[in-house]
Amino acid sequence: MKAVVYNLNGEAVKEIDLPAVFEEEYRPDLIKRAFLSAFTARLQPKGSDPLAGLRTSAKNIGKGHGRARVDRVPQGWAARVPQAVGGRRAHPPKVEKILWERVNKKERIKAIKSAIAATANPELVKERGHVFETENLPIIVESSFEELQKTKDVFAVFEKLGISDDVIRAKNGIKIRAGKGKMRGRKYKKPRSILVVVGDKCNAILASRNLPGVDVITAKDLGIIHLAPGGVAGRLTVWTESALEKLKERFE
């Protein structure tokens, strides 16, 4: 499988052979499983204080008094029991609960390969809602892209590649979240836009990540979370030449 390599002016400069991973079969079932495993692995176990609602002098005086046999404080009102104000919860969250959905190692690797191959499928990328003008996927740029230090320079390259509209789509799609998440450090819901995969740590990482919805990752750290947000593959992805070399080393 061959692909076109573009320079920073959006001009096709050569054709290269893609790594074999781009010919992997599309497996949405494995991608979903691997995403849920990676997502739940990030969740922090939570639980209540074992003594919550139990710090009281209330006691049960037993039957024969013509009233409910609940624990009561000397003043007469109920305490400790779940149906009482200030009482314990009946079934509070427990830290022992298993949150992480495990997935087999070979399944996870196959899912990542399948999600990588999905980035080269224009139909899957469009189904995911991305906006772009080019039909030549995957989008590969010269390694000189990694030397860019300014966000405006990165956006200029995106414009020349015909994918800048997707960044604008993400910017216009930022909404205030409904519910209590607003009070918990996640006020805004932000659409996912372009994924940039580079060969190693470089200036372009800092230059690219300020664009709305854009994520930047090295080929070594590339995972299903980046390739298939929400468990849906087909993310619009820009690869550098050096990233493809690292990808070949990783999977072949």
UniProtKB/Swiss-Prot annotation:
GO terms for biological process: translation. Keywords: Ribonucleoprotein, Ribosomal protein, RNA-binding, rRNA-binding. GO terms for cellular component: cytosolic large ribosomal subunit. The keyword DNA damage does not apply. It comes from the Archaea. Belongs to the universal ribosomal protein uL4 family. NCBIfam families: rpl4p_arch. Part of the 50S ribosomal subunit. This is Large ribosomal subunit protein uL4. It comes from Methanocaldococcus jannaschii (strain ATCC 43067 / DSM 2661 / JAL-1 / JCM 10045 / NBRC 100440). The lineage of its organism: Archaea, Methanobacteriati, Methanobacteriota, Methanomada group, Methanococci.
